[in-house]
Design a protein with these regions (language model features):
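Phosphate-binding loop of NTP-binding sites
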Residues: 1-110, 117, 128-134, 151
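Hydrophobic alpha-helical transmembrane segments
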Residues: 120-123
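Gly/charged, well-structured mid-domain segments that form the phosphate/adenylate-handling core
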Residues: 133-152
Length: 152
């Protein structure tokens, strides 16, 4: 994601860096731990998890530390987001950041989407909001988007 090596765990597309993972869904807590270990061994700096019933079983994130939660529904409060993810065993602590799309992330995503010829930039905007919440500077995000565009 934006220049950092990441893993993705989602029922629609799980991968460790560039390698696709063949997993049986929904994942249990042990499955999540095993998959995250594979991602770490491959050199992933972070793992993006889809928090939905198709991907995860109840309490599948019991021993997982979550730094950033993102929700595409900007109408939800932080407390409502925390309640929604609690069924997966995800504890929202003082260090957890809850991110949602913002005007800033929408603008950056729209600029990048135009360069790629895409019309929908919502998922990119949410990704940008997540890395902003994680503490990545806006200049670094712009640079990563530029490099990504140049590589494509």
């Amino acid at each position: 994601m934006l220049g950092n090596p990441v893993g993705v765990i989602s029922s629609s597309d799980s991968q460790s860096l560039e390698r696709f993972l063949n997993l049986g869904y929904p994942l249990s807590a042990i499955d999540v731990q095993r998959t995250m270990a594979v991602c770490a061994e491959d050199g992933a700096a972070a793992v993006i998890l889809a928090l939905d019933e198709e991907t995860l079983r109840k309490d599948a994130l019991q021993s997982v530390s979550v730094d950033v939660l993102a929700c595409d529904d900007n109408g939800l409060s932080d407390a409502e987001v925390a309640k929604l993810v609690a069924k997966f065993g995800c504890a929202v602590g003082k260090q957890t950041r809850i991110a949602g799309r913002t005007q800033e992330s929408d603008l950056l995503a729209a600029q990048a989407a135009t360069a790629y010829g895409q019309t929908d930039s919502r998922s990119l905007s949410l990704s940008i909001a997540m890395v902003l919440a994680a503490g990545v500077r806006k200049a670094n995000i712009k640079s990563a988007l530029r490099v990504s565009r140049d590589l494509n």
